[in-house]
């Protein structure tokens, strides 16, 4: 039975690497945000607005506990998931946790391209975006660093890099 939780900041590649890794290993893939959206028929943004951060984080925690019961699965968590309640410890108890560590400049490049799709980032200038990323990483690093495995995920820009990362992650996890 395999349970792998991918954690890291938005734009770290949790979904990109998670899907590719799950496919390679014949595992199921779950994006926790998508799982929540499917269950409640609302976007994460809508749930956040309706319930506030505390209400959303409690809901997220319940959904994390639900998906942690699944077997043979790779779970891509929300960027903030490890930072609330006992979520990080819970994931460590339930399976392997992998922190996808990405340099701030790489996150900036990835998020700058997709910032209109991310409400938190949509109206930020380049300077504000970089500051936002650095501040968030500083706050979240103590939680992310509790992962059982650290994996550098700076190179996920094309199929070759993604496959190389999948191969490296397999070796790291002895799979």
UniProtKB/Swiss-Prot annotation:
Alphabetized Pfam families for the sequence: SKI (PF01202)
GO cellular component assignments: cytosol
Pathway where it operates: Metabolic intermediate biosynthesis; chorismate biosynthesis; chorismate from D-erythrose 4-phosphate and phosphoenolpyruvate: step 5/7
Any GO MF annotation of the entry: magnesium ion binding
Catalytic activity, as annotated: shikimate + ATP = 3-phosphoshikimate + ADP + H(+)
Binding site for substrate: 33, 57, 79, 140
Binding site for Mg(2+): 15
Domain of life per record: Bacteria
Named cofactor requirement(s): Mg(2+)
Keywords of the record: Amino-acid biosynthesis, Aromatic amino acid biosynthesis, ATP-binding, Cytoplasm, Kinase, Magnesium, Metal-binding, Nucleotide-binding, Transferase
Cellular localisation: Cytoplasm
GO BP term, example: chorismate biosynthetic process
EC number: 2.7.1.71
Residues reported to bind ATP: 11-16, 118
Cofactor note: Binds 1 Mg(2+) ion per subunit.
Main function: Catalyzes the specific phosphorylation of the 3-hydroxyl group of shikimic acid using ATP as a cosubstrate.
Family indicated by similarity: Belongs to the shikimate kinase family.
Subunit structure: Monomer.
The protein's name in its UniProt record: Shikimate kinase
Native source organism of the sequence: Phocaeicola vulgatus (strain ATCC 8482 / DSM 1447 / JCM 5826 / CCUG 4940 / NBRC 14291 / NCTC 11154)
